[in-house]
Every structure is written in structure tokens, then in C-alpha cells.
């Protein structure tokens, strides 16, 4: 299970570490790495995800703190994709991201799900919920207040009605 918190910069990435190290974080303590083995594989993995997600950076060794917010979010997505998690919890993952980066992330999220994984998307953006989700579950006081299946009217109005 992977988790992308809303505050990627403080809760998900280590700014002083490189793009490569952040993407390959789940493998950093794998056998063989304490002796310096595996570095080329990290660079290859990071470069592959940089290309697939169109992460705009100078090199895999660039500190992740030097990237734009959208590219940092792409690094965080790449981290969980390379970890081969089957469930990904995403909390406000697209908030404040430039349109070009947003499209890349939308496309990759859809590919991730088509590959058999599941995503729990937590969002206050009704259009995202309606466009990306198979179902929208409206939560109220810790319980499901309403389930809106794909194609249902997952608008601000219908969601607010479920909350009242």
C-alpha cells in the first residue's frame, strides 16, 4: 500500500536527497546496497520513471527540493509505482499542479489502474472525482453517507446534499 499525502514536500519526500534516491526509496536498504552494489540499477530505474512521467529535472542526482511542485509530486508518484504497490492512497494529489503536469499525472494514474492496481482518491475537486473514479463515496461523520457510481452526478450539489 502506498500513500501520497497532501503535503508532499513535508511528508513524502526528502528534499536533500536526489530525485533518484526519492524514487528508489523503498529499495535503499535492499541486500547488496550496503556494499555499494545496485547504484546503476537505481539510476536506470529513476531515469525510466523520469521519462515515463516526464519529470523535468537536470539529472537523477538533482536534489528533489530544486524541482517544481508538480515535478515533486511526479517523483512521489514514481516512488510508489516502482515499489509495485497494488493500492495507492492519494490525498489531494493534483492540488496546485500546473496543467501540463496535471495531464501527465492523470494519464499515469489511469494507466496504473488499468494495470490492475487500485487507487483511493481523496479530493475536494468534484470534477476530478467524477472524471477519475469508478465510484465516489461521500463520507459524513466517519460513515459512508452516499455512494455515487461512475456516470452518476458527482457534482458539488449532489455531494453537498449527501452531507446534509
List where the protein language model places each region.
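Glycine-rich phosphate-binding loops of nucleotide-dependent enzymes
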Residues: 1-164
Amino acid at each position: 500500500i502506498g500513500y501520497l499525502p497532501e503535503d508532499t514536500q513535508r511528508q513524502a519526500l526528502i528534499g536533500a536527497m536526489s530525485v533518484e534516491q526519492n524514487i528508489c526509496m523503498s529499495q535503499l536498504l535492499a541486500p547488496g546496497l550496503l556494499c555499494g552494489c545496485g547504484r546503476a540499477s537505481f539510476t536506470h530505474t529513476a531515469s525510466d520513471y523520469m521519462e515515463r512521467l516526464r519529470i523535468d529535472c537536470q539529472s537523477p542526482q538533482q536534489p528533489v527540493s530544486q524541482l517544481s511542485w508538480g515535478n515533486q509530486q511526479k517523483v512521489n508518484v514514481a516512488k510508489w509505482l516502482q515499489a509495485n504497490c497494488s493500492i495507492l492512497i492519494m490525498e489531494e494529489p493534483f492540488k496546485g499542479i500546473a496543467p501540463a503536469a496535471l495531464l501527465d499525472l492523470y494519464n499515469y494514474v489511469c494507466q496504473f489502474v488499468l494495470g490492475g492496481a487500485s487507487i483511493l482518491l481523496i479530493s475536494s475537486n468534484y470534477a476530478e472525482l467524477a472524471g477519475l473514479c469508478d465510484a465516489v463515496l461521500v463520507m459524513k461523520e466517519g460513515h459512508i453517507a452516499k455512494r455515487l457510481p461512475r456516470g452518476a452526478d458527482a457534482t458539488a450539489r449532489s455531494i453537498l446534499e449527501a452531507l446534509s
